[in-house]
Design a protein with these regions (language model features):
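Surface-exposed, charged/polar loop-rich segments
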Residues: 1-32, 36, 42-49, 132
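Extended, C-terminal/distal alpha-helical "rod" segments
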Residues: 48-233
Length: 233
């Protein structure tokens, strides 16, 4: 279609009651391009079959089972899309959100993997392998936060008034991590304490009146689902 203006116009002509849209191609180097491609495909679903019929390419038309796979892939990738979108829009510091975002994504993948392990349909079995690979890749990226000198991600997390040290004192964290991050935080404050002690200057307290961002809302509660939770029944 992209190589043929005539075919593109023919595809547009099928869209009589909506804006004229073309499919989006996945681009490996572009963030969220897979999600955007699938979302556009779902929107254009009514036009693909008649377009394929017109050019006698029924072999390229997706069946109901393949559309079901697209629905599920959209559900899987939506949280990644939402977090990427919000992080790219914000102009504020986001270091204190890193662990929360990872936790949300791990939880999402784990729930999906647990559901898929009960399935025996071939495409769901293949999807399980893909999700397990995605989970491992996310673990690899998460492990890199430990390599940052001085545990800066943890310190940034504790500096957020809504987190403090108690963020690392929940059942999700082993006690050793809270102890380690507490020591790192204390070490981080040493030069500032010395500087403050030499000046003896008190800074006026200023309360923040800012309302929470959408990113705060996403991390503070269960992320809203625009797609059905159960895509595997």
């Amino acid at each position: 279609m992209n190589a043929s203006p005539q075919r593109r116009d023919a595809f547009y002509a099928l869209q009589t009651e909506s804006a004229k849209l073309a499919p989006i191609q996945d681009v490996k180097t572009r963030w969220n391009s897979t999600f955007l491609m699938l979302r556009r495909a779902k929107r254009l679903r009514p036009y693909f079959t008649p377009f394929c019929d017109e050019y006698e390419r029924s072999d390229l038309a997706l069946d109901d089972d393949e559309w079901r796979q697209i629905e599920y892939l959209l559900w899987i990738t939506q949280p990644f899309f939402e977090f990427t979108l919000e992080l790219s829009k914000t102009k504020d510091a986001t270091t204190h959100h890193v662990f929360k975002i990872y936790n949300k994504l791990f939880e999402h993948l784990e729930q999906s993997i647990t559901q898929l392990r009960r399935k025996r349909v071939p495409w769901k079995t293949n999807m399980l392998q893909a999700l397990e690979a995605a989970q491992q890749k996310l673990k690899d990226y998460y492990a890199e936060t430990d390599d940052i000198r001085g545990d800066l991600y943890a310190i940034g997390t504790m500096l957020a008034p809504t987190n403090k040290l108690r963020f690392f004192q929940t059942d999700e964290w082993e006690e050793q991590w809270a102890q380690r991050y507490r020591r790192s935080f204390q070490d981080y404050l040493i030069p500032y304490k010395a500087r403050l002690g030499s000046t003896q200057t008190s800074l006026p307290y200023q309360s923040s009146k800012r309302s929470g961002s959408r990113l705060d809302m996403m991390l503070g509660s269960q992320q809203p689902d625009n797609l059905s939770r159960d895509k595997l029944s």
